[in-house]
Design a protein with these regions (language model features):
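Generic internal hydrophobic packing segments that stabilize the cores of diverse globular domains
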Residues: 64, 79, 90-93
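Short loop-beta-helix segment that forms the pyridoxal 5′-phosphate
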Residues: 76-85
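Conserved "HGTGT" condensation-loop signature of ketosynthase/thiolase-family condensing enzymes
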Residues: 1-77, 113-163
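Active-site-proximal alpha-helical scaffold in enzymes
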Residues: 84-114, 157-163
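Short, conserved beta-strand segments within well-ordered enzyme catalytic domains
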Residues: 50-52, 81, 108
Length: 163
């Protein structure tokens, strides 16, 4: 089994819903960060074999491929999108590690992206005239305190003094 290493990590700033980043689509948010992490880690973009991105609030299509095309990655790099609530970005990273360990790829860029400002709008019923923003469904019993993953991450970071 081939060894796998994480050689870089970056994230965007956090912005409130309808805040300063609300005009940017997810590929516009993610592409500069991907370009930056590749450059900072000393990897050449043409060395990247795969891009894996988690996006749970997407409107469909293949956000990962759109991100690959918007970044400096070569056109041959595909885009695999994971649709999973909570820890989808970590799943993308773990899948990238497994691809490297299995020898199916040498360099994988992986992570997650969301834009609550740009989440899809849907009809509650097929012929309903009321538009409803897509919100994450309940995943825990009412007895558990359900918070979004980002909020949980900030609480853990604060508790352990991480910045």
């Amino acid at each position: 089994m081939q060894s796998a290493y994480i050689v870089g990590a970056k994230r965007s700033i956090v912005s409130p819903i309808n805040g300063p980043l609300s005009s940017l689509q997810i590929h516009e948010l993610a592409a500069p960060i991907i370009n930056n992490v590749i450059e900072a880690s000393g990897i050449k973009s043409d060395e990247v074999d795969e891009l894996i991105v988690s996006n749970a609030l997407g409107a469909g299509g293949n956000p990962s491929r759109l991100i690959a095309l918007a970044s400096n990655l070569p056109e041959r790099v595909g885009g695999l999108t994971i649709d999973r609530q909570c820890v989808g970005g970590l799943d993308a990273i773990m899948l990238g590690i497994k691809l490297v360990q299995a020898g199916a790829a040498n360099v994988v860029v992986a992570g997650g992206v969301e834009s609550f400002s740009n989440r899809p709008i849907r009809l509650a019923q097929e012929y309903d005239k009321i538009l409803v923003p897509y919100d994450t469904p309940e995943f825990t019993p009412d007895s558990d305190q359900e918070i979004h993953m980002a909020e949980a991450a900030f609480k853990v970071a604060e508790k352990f003094g991480l910045t």
